[in-house]
Amino acid sequence: MCIRDRYYAETVIKKSLDKLYNLAQGGTAVGSGVNSPRGFDKKFIQHLKKISKLPFKTASNKYEALASHDVFIEVMSGIEILTSSLFKMANDIRVLASGPRSGIAELILPANEPGSSIMPGKINPTQCEALSMVCAHVIGLKNSITFACTQGHFQLNVYNPLIIHNTLDSINLISDALISFDKNCLKGIRANKAKIKELLNNSLMLVTPLTKVIGYDLASKVALNAYNKDISLKQSCMELTNLSEADFEKYTNPKNMV
Protein backbone atom coordinates (compact mmCIF):
# COMPACT_ATOMS: atom_id res chain seq x y z
CA MET A 1 0.00 0.00 0.00
CA CYS A 2 2.50 2.61 -1.18
CA ILE A 3 5.10 1.94 1.53
CA ARG A 4 7.88 2.80 -0.92
CA ASP A 5 6.06 6.06 -1.77
CA ARG A 6 6.27 6.96 1.89
CA TYR A 7 10.04 6.44 1.86
CA TYR A 8 10.37 8.41 -1.38
CA ALA A 9 8.41 11.29 0.16
CA GLU A 10 10.69 11.16 3.21
CA THR A 11 13.76 11.36 0.96
CA VAL A 12 12.38 14.38 -0.94
CA ILE A 13 11.47 16.19 2.29
CA LYS A 14 14.85 15.54 3.93
CA LYS A 15 16.75 16.73 0.85
CA SER A 16 14.80 19.99 0.80
CA LEU A 17 15.36 20.72 4.50
CA ASP A 18 18.98 21.76 3.95
CA LYS A 19 17.82 24.59 1.70
CA LEU A 20 15.31 25.76 4.30
CA TYR A 21 18.16 26.58 6.67
CA ASN A 22 19.43 29.36 4.38
CA LEU A 23 18.28 32.68 5.89
CA ALA A 24 18.24 36.18 4.41
CA GLN A 25 18.71 38.08 7.68
CA GLY A 26 21.23 40.85 7.16
CA GLY A 27 20.13 41.43 3.58
CA THR A 28 17.87 44.30 4.69
CA ALA A 29 15.25 45.39 2.15
CA VAL A 30 16.24 43.73 -1.11
CA GLY A 31 19.33 41.65 -0.28
CA SER A 32 22.05 44.28 -0.64
CA GLY A 33 22.73 44.50 3.09
CA VAL A 34 22.69 48.31 3.01
CA ASN A 35 22.54 49.79 6.56
CA SER A 36 23.08 46.37 8.15
CA PRO A 37 25.94 46.32 10.71
CA ARG A 38 28.99 44.46 9.47
CA GLY A 39 28.86 40.81 10.52
CA PHE A 40 25.23 41.02 11.69
CA ASP A 41 24.12 38.12 9.48
CA LYS A 42 26.74 35.73 10.88
CA LYS A 43 26.12 36.76 14.51
CA PHE A 44 22.38 36.36 14.01
CA ILE A 45 22.87 32.84 12.63
CA GLN A 46 25.19 31.88 15.49
CA HIS A 47 22.62 32.97 18.07
CA LEU A 48 19.74 31.27 16.25
CA LYS A 49 21.69 28.01 15.96
CA LYS A 50 22.44 28.16 19.67
CA ILE A 51 18.83 28.56 20.79
CA SER A 52 17.23 26.33 18.15
CA LYS A 53 19.86 23.55 17.92
CA LEU A 54 19.30 23.58 14.15
CA PRO A 55 21.93 24.06 11.39
CA PHE A 56 20.81 27.45 10.11
CA LYS A 57 23.18 29.33 7.82
CA THR A 58 23.31 32.69 6.11
CA ALA A 59 22.14 32.61 2.51
CA SER A 60 24.97 32.98 0.00
CA ASN A 61 22.67 35.02 -2.26
CA LYS A 62 20.43 37.22 -0.14
CA TYR A 63 18.84 38.82 -3.20
CA GLU A 64 17.50 35.42 -4.25
CA ALA A 65 16.55 34.49 -0.68
CA LEU A 66 14.30 37.55 -0.38
CA ALA A 67 12.79 37.52 -3.86
CA SER A 68 12.16 33.79 -4.19
CA HIS A 69 10.82 31.17 -1.79
CA ASP A 70 10.83 28.24 -4.19
CA VAL A 71 12.31 25.98 -1.53
CA PHE A 72 8.87 25.89 0.11
CA ILE A 73 7.43 24.45 -3.09
CA GLU A 74 10.10 21.77 -2.91
CA VAL A 75 9.30 20.99 0.73
CA MET A 76 5.58 20.93 0.06
CA SER A 77 6.10 18.72 -2.99
CA GLY A 78 7.55 16.09 -0.66
CA ILE A 79 4.60 16.54 1.69
CA GLU A 80 2.22 16.30 -1.27
CA ILE A 81 3.83 13.00 -2.30
CA LEU A 82 3.26 11.79 1.25
CA THR A 83 -0.38 12.92 1.25
CA SER A 84 -1.01 11.21 -2.10
CA SER A 85 0.44 7.98 -0.72
CA LEU A 86 -1.57 8.28 2.50
CA PHE A 87 -4.75 9.02 0.55
CA LYS A 88 -4.28 5.84 -1.47
CA MET A 89 -3.50 3.81 1.65
CA ALA A 90 -6.59 5.08 3.47
CA ASN A 91 -8.77 4.42 0.43
CA ASP A 92 -7.37 0.90 -0.03
CA ILE A 93 -8.04 0.07 3.61
CA ARG A 94 -11.56 1.50 3.39
CA VAL A 95 -12.42 -0.58 0.32
CA LEU A 96 -10.77 -3.76 1.63
CA ALA A 97 -12.84 -3.37 4.80
CA SER A 98 -16.12 -2.85 2.93
CA GLY A 99 -18.88 -5.21 3.91
CA PRO A 100 -19.18 -7.03 6.17
CA ARG A 101 -21.19 -9.33 3.85
CA SER A 102 -21.76 -7.44 0.64
CA GLY A 103 -18.25 -6.09 0.13
CA ILE A 104 -14.67 -7.34 0.06
CA ALA A 105 -14.37 -7.54 3.86
CA GLU A 106 -10.77 -8.77 3.93
CA LEU A 107 -10.02 -6.34 6.75
CA ILE A 108 -11.90 -5.74 9.99
CA LEU A 109 -11.60 -2.17 11.25
CA PRO A 110 -11.82 -1.21 14.93
CA ALA A 111 -15.18 0.25 15.97
CA ASN A 112 -14.24 3.75 17.14
CA GLU A 113 -17.84 4.94 17.38
CA PRO A 114 -21.20 3.33 18.23
CA GLY A 115 -21.88 2.98 14.50
CA SER A 116 -24.13 4.47 11.88
CA SER A 117 -26.96 6.69 13.11
CA ILE A 118 -29.17 5.19 10.38
CA MET A 119 -28.06 1.55 10.12
CA PRO A 120 -27.60 -0.18 13.50
CA GLY A 121 -24.41 -2.20 13.83
CA LYS A 122 -22.71 -0.60 10.83
CA ILE A 123 -19.03 0.18 11.41
CA ASN A 124 -17.98 3.31 9.55
CA PRO A 125 -14.38 3.74 8.28
CA THR A 126 -14.17 7.13 9.98
CA GLN A 127 -10.40 7.19 10.43
CA CYS A 128 -9.85 6.45 6.74
CA GLU A 129 -12.27 9.19 5.81
CA ALA A 130 -10.68 11.65 8.24
CA LEU A 131 -7.18 10.98 6.92
CA SER A 132 -8.30 11.34 3.30
CA MET A 133 -9.95 14.68 4.08
CA VAL A 134 -6.78 15.95 5.75
CA CYS A 135 -4.80 14.87 2.69
CA ALA A 136 -7.20 16.71 0.38
CA HIS A 137 -6.90 19.84 2.52
CA VAL A 138 -3.10 19.71 2.60
CA ILE A 139 -2.96 19.34 -1.19
CA GLY A 140 -5.05 22.54 -1.36
CA LEU A 141 -2.67 24.30 1.04
CA LYS A 142 0.24 23.27 -1.15
CA ASN A 143 -1.43 24.83 -4.18
CA SER A 144 -1.89 28.11 -2.32
CA ILE A 145 1.81 28.03 -1.35
CA THR A 146 2.76 27.49 -4.99
CA PHE A 147 0.70 30.55 -5.95
CA ALA A 148 2.20 32.60 -3.11
CA CYS A 149 5.69 31.76 -4.35
CA THR A 150 4.86 33.37 -7.71
CA GLN A 151 4.34 36.72 -6.00
CA GLY A 152 8.00 37.66 -5.73
CA HIS A 153 7.77 40.87 -7.74
CA PHE A 154 11.24 42.14 -8.54
CA GLN A 155 13.35 41.91 -5.35
CA LEU A 156 10.76 41.04 -2.71
CA ASN A 157 8.05 38.47 -2.03
CA VAL A 158 5.70 39.73 0.68
CA TYR A 159 3.55 36.58 0.74
CA ASN A 160 5.77 35.08 3.45
CA PRO A 161 2.98 34.96 6.07
CA LEU A 162 0.75 32.84 3.81
CA ILE A 163 3.64 30.58 2.82
CA ILE A 164 4.80 30.00 6.40
CA HIS A 165 1.27 29.65 7.81
CA ASN A 166 0.19 27.05 5.26
CA THR A 167 3.46 25.13 5.46
CA LEU A 168 3.25 24.83 9.25
CA ASP A 169 -0.48 24.12 9.05
CA SER A 170 0.19 21.29 6.58
CA ILE A 171 2.87 19.75 8.79
CA ASN A 172 0.70 19.93 11.90
CA LEU A 173 -2.38 18.53 10.15
CA ILE A 174 -0.53 15.58 8.62
CA SER A 175 1.30 14.85 11.88
CA ASP A 176 -1.90 14.86 13.95
CA ALA A 177 -3.77 12.83 11.33
CA LEU A 178 -1.05 10.17 11.23
CA ILE A 179 -0.97 9.84 15.01
CA SER A 180 -4.76 9.47 15.13
CA PHE A 181 -4.83 7.03 12.19
CA ASP A 182 -2.14 4.87 13.76
CA LYS A 183 -3.76 4.87 17.20
CA ASN A 184 -7.40 4.50 16.18
CA CYS A 185 -7.14 2.42 13.02
CA LEU A 186 -3.86 0.73 12.11
CA LYS A 187 -3.17 -0.76 15.53
CA GLY A 188 -6.66 -2.25 15.69
CA ILE A 189 -6.97 -3.64 12.15
CA ARG A 190 -7.51 -7.40 11.93
CA ALA A 191 -7.28 -9.65 8.90
CA ASN A 192 -10.46 -11.58 8.10
CA LYS A 193 -8.59 -14.79 7.32
CA ALA A 194 -11.68 -16.82 6.46
CA LYS A 195 -12.86 -14.21 3.94
CA ILE A 196 -9.39 -13.81 2.47
CA LYS A 197 -9.13 -17.57 1.96
CA GLU A 198 -12.59 -17.69 0.38
CA LEU A 199 -11.84 -14.90 -2.09
CA LEU A 200 -8.41 -16.30 -2.87
CA ASN A 201 -9.71 -19.78 -3.61
CA ASN A 202 -12.53 -18.41 -5.77
CA SER A 203 -10.33 -16.01 -7.73
CA LEU A 204 -10.33 -16.68 -11.46
CA MET A 205 -7.09 -14.76 -11.79
CA LEU A 206 -5.22 -17.74 -10.39
CA VAL A 207 -5.38 -18.98 -13.98
CA THR A 208 -2.59 -16.54 -14.90
CA PRO A 209 0.39 -18.79 -13.98
CA LEU A 210 -1.24 -21.61 -16.00
CA THR A 211 -0.58 -19.73 -19.25
CA LYS A 212 3.01 -20.95 -19.31
CA VAL A 213 1.76 -24.55 -18.87
CA ILE A 214 -1.38 -24.83 -21.01
CA GLY A 215 -1.06 -21.70 -23.15
CA TYR A 216 -2.89 -18.38 -23.14
CA ASP A 217 -5.88 -19.42 -25.27
CA LEU A 218 -6.70 -22.52 -23.24
CA ALA A 219 -6.15 -20.66 -19.98
CA SER A 220 -8.69 -18.06 -21.16
CA LYS A 221 -11.22 -20.81 -21.92
CA VAL A 222 -10.67 -22.32 -18.47
CA ALA A 223 -11.34 -18.99 -16.75
CA LEU A 224 -14.42 -18.17 -18.85
CA ASN A 225 -15.81 -21.68 -18.41
CA ALA A 226 -15.46 -21.39 -14.63
CA TYR A 227 -17.18 -18.02 -14.68
CA ASN A 228 -20.06 -19.02 -16.97
CA LYS A 229 -20.78 -22.27 -15.12
CA ASP A 230 -20.16 -20.77 -11.67
CA ILE A 231 -17.68 -23.50 -10.79
CA SER A 232 -14.19 -23.36 -9.34
CA LEU A 233 -11.15 -22.77 -11.49
CA LYS A 234 -9.91 -26.20 -10.51
CA GLN A 235 -13.11 -27.90 -11.69
CA SER A 236 -12.95 -26.02 -14.98
CA CYS A 237 -9.32 -26.96 -15.48
CA MET A 238 -10.12 -30.62 -14.88
CA GLU A 239 -12.89 -30.41 -17.49
CA LEU A 240 -10.93 -28.75 -20.26
CA THR A 241 -7.30 -29.82 -19.81
CA ASN A 242 -5.18 -32.87 -19.10
CA LEU A 243 -3.56 -31.18 -16.12
CA SER A 244 -3.55 -33.28 -12.95
CA GLU A 245 -4.94 -31.96 -9.67
CA ALA A 246 -1.45 -32.05 -8.18
CA ASP A 247 -0.03 -29.95 -11.01
CA PHE A 248 -2.95 -27.53 -10.79
CA GLU A 249 -2.30 -27.01 -7.07
CA LYS A 250 1.40 -26.63 -7.76
CA TYR A 251 1.08 -23.95 -10.43
CA THR A 252 -1.75 -21.96 -8.83
CA ASN A 253 -0.37 -21.88 -5.30
CA PRO A 254 -0.57 -18.19 -4.27
CA LYS A 255 2.48 -18.61 -2.04
CA ASN A 256 4.58 -18.99 -5.18
CA MET A 257 3.39 -15.61 -6.43
CA VAL A 258 4.41 -13.53 -3.42
Predicted regions and their residues:
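Short, small-residue-biased leader/transition segments that mark boundaries at the very start
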Residues: 1-3
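Amphipathic alpha-helical coiled-coil segments
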Residues: 6, 13, 75, 79-82, ...
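Heptad-repeat coiled-coil/leucine-zipper interface motif in alpha-helices
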Residues: 9, 16, 82-85, 96, ...
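Glycine-rich phosphate/diphosphate-binding loop of Rossmann-like nucleotide-binding domains
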Residues: 10-24, 42, 46
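Heptad-repeat coiled-coil alpha-helices
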Residues: 15, 19-22, 95, 102, ...
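FAD-binding core of FAD-dependent oxidoreductases
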Residues: 17-37
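Acidic, glycine-rich loop-and-beta core segments that form the ion-binding/anion-interacting portion
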Residues: 30-116
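Catalytic-core signal marking the mid-to-C-terminal active-site face
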Residues: 64, 68, 91, 98-258
